[in-house]
């Protein structure tokens, strides 16, 4: 398997930051109450991941090992500030909805973890690919979890899409069920914990079924030769 395919497999499935590494749970649980919020935070995290991986890879040979972590954090904080300003300018409603969780991207273990474990040891192109696929893996889990919680909690899908994509996106809103009252358990953090648990369980079931289909290799039987004195 090529290095690029390995990065895709690791980011999207085998080493998914949300379902396998269980990193970034704070924003994952708090913000994924709707697809719009989940997608907005996921895109912001993806952009910061790619930017930080590229930046760290570029300076990896010029930063002393003793101060590399503070330098990495400064790079990540600068990129998060840029993303925050862009969101404030072009998606102000979503910016208000996400609130403190945008600047908290700085402390997201996924970003500093990939910077330290991968970007600081690899060239720019592989580092950018790693950041993209890890970010896309995180975003996909956010969106799936957000869709589950929004459908169960409010009976809608893509509610508030205009906050992210503009006024035209209000037509994307789908009313799946009609509830007199919202199902708060799905919209609050306990519902997010339950949803993440279901997604992790589903992934484990799929992995176990895939392993069971693979042909089992029988271990060769090694016979010991007994040597006796003549």
Swiss-Prot record:
Which Pfam family is one of this chain's hits? Answer: Rnf-Nqr
Where's it mainly located? membrane
Its Gene Ontology cellular component terms are:
plasma membrane
Membrane-related topology note: Multi-pass membrane protein
Which residues does UniProt call coiled coil? none
Q: What is its EC number?
A: 7.-.-.-
Tell me which UniProt keywords the record has, alphabetically.
Cell inner membrane, Cell membrane, Electron transport, Membrane, Translocase, Transmembrane, Transmembrane helix, Transport
Transmembrane region(s): 11-31, 39-59, 69-89, 93-113, 132-152, 182-202
Which processes are annotated in GO (biological process)? electron transport chain
Provide the protein's localization.
Cell inner membrane
Q: Which InterPro entries does this UniProt record tie to the protein?
A: NqrDE/RnfAE (IPR003667), RnfE (IPR010968)
Q: Which domain of life is it from?
A: Bacteria
Q: What does this protein do?
A: Part of a membrane-bound complex that couples electron transfer with translocation of ions across the membrane.
| Assembly behavior | The complex is composed of six subunits: RnfA, RnfB, RnfC, RnfD, RnfE and RnfG.
Q: Which family does it belong to?
A: Belongs to the NqrDE/RnfAE family.
Protein name, entry field: Ion-translocating oxidoreductase complex subunit E
Species for this entry: Vibrio atlanticus (strain LGP32)
Q: Which gene carries the instructions for this protein? A: rnfE
């Amino acid at each position: 398997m090529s290095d690029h395919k390995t990065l895709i497999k690791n980011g999207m499935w085998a080493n998914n930051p949300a379902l396998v590494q269980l990193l970034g749970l704070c924003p994952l649980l708090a913000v994924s109450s709707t697809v719009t919020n989940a997608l907005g935070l996921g895109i912001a995290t993806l952009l910061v991941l790619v930017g930080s991986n590229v930046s760290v890879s570029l300076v990896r040979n010029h930063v002393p090992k003793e101060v590399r972590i503070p330098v990495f954090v400064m790079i990540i904080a600068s990129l998060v500030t840029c993303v925050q300003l862009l969101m404030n300018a072009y998606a102000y409603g979503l910016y208000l909805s996400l609130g403190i969780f945008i600047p908290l991207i700085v402390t997201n273990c996924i970003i500093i973890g990939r910077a330290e474990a991968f970007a600081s040891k690899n060239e720019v192109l592989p580092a950018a690919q790693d950041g993209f696929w890890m970010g896309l893996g995180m975003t996909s889990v956010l969106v799936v979890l957000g869709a589950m919680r929004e459908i169960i909690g409010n009976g809608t899908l893509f509610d508030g899409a205009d906050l992210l994509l503009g006024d035209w996106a209000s037509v994307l809103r789908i009313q799946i069920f009609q509830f007199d009252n919202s199902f708060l358990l799905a919209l609050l953090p306990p519902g997010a914990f339950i949803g993440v648990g279901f997604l992790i369980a589903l992934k484990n079931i799929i992995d176990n079924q895939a392993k069971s289909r693979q042909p089992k290799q029988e271990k060769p039987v090694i016979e010991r030769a007994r040597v006796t004195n003549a």
